[in-house]
A protein has these predicted regions:
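C-terminal domain-boundary segment and adjacent tail
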Residues: 58-59, 117-167
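Alpha-helical structural signal in soluble globular domains
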Residues: 25, 29, 50-54, 144-152
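A generic secondary-structure signal
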Residues: 21-28, 109-117, 148
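Well-ordered, non-membrane alpha-helical segments in soluble/globular domains
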Residues: 18-19, 100-110, 139-145
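Residue-level preference for long, well-ordered alpha-helices that form the structural scaffold
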Residues: 4, 11, 15, 96-103, ...
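Metal-dependent polysaccharide deacetylase catalytic core of the NodB/CE4 family, i.e.
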Residues: 1-49, 68-70, 81-90, 127
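Active-site-adjacent pocket scaffolds in enzyme catalytic domains
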Residues: 38-118
């Protein structure tokens, strides 16, 4: 399937056909979740309206969502924090780990914004991971974050089917 970027200049029907074909291929697997995480977590806004027509019920991009349900039949929940410094602007190393302190501060900032009206309180705080690009330190951080927060009574880790109401 060709990349579907925010600046994809192909006709919408070609992009939607690629998405539908990909969805059909994924449909051959058990427990398929009808949700889309587009390449680089970006999709051209004019394509979103076609997603429910091809069976996609959930969408995740990067940054704050504008609406929980951008179009009838589609629920959106985005990621807000990336573990990788892709261009090396913060760490000095392209594709480097942003570090535990930085990521925890970002998580706390997003949670604070949710509680004080600065972010959509109904949108789960999303952490973006990249299994193919992560090193041991990144995997260890994510594992420790999940394990430590899972034990806290105020934390609820949700399944993707819950986040996108596809259960």
């Amino acid at each position: 399937m060709a990349g579907i970027l925010a600046d994809d200049s192909r006709p919408a029907e070609h992009v939607v056909a690629d998405l539908a074909m990909g969805g059909q291929a994924l449909g051959k697997f058990a427990n398929r979740l009808p949700a889309l995480v587009p390449p680089w977590n970006r999709i051209a806004p004019h394509l979103v309206r076609f997603l429910p027509e091809i069976g996609i019920r959930g969408l995740s991009t990067i940054g704050a969502r504008t609406r929980e349900v951008p179009i009838r039949g589609l629920r959106q929940n985005n990621v807000h924090i990336d573990v990788i410094d892709w261009r090396g602007k913060r760490t000095g190393t392209a594709r480097g780990f942003l570090g535990s302190d930085f990521i925890i501060n970002e998580v706390v900032s997003h949670l604070h914004a949710r509680r004080t009206g600065g972010a959509d309180a109904g949108e789960a705080t999303g952490l973006m991971t990249h299994h193919a690009d992560m090193d041991d330190a990144m995997f260890e951080f994510v594992t420790e974050l999940v394990n430590r927060t899972r034990a806290h009574p105020a934390v609820v880790w949700q399944r993707a089917s819950e986040v996108f109401s596809c259960s």
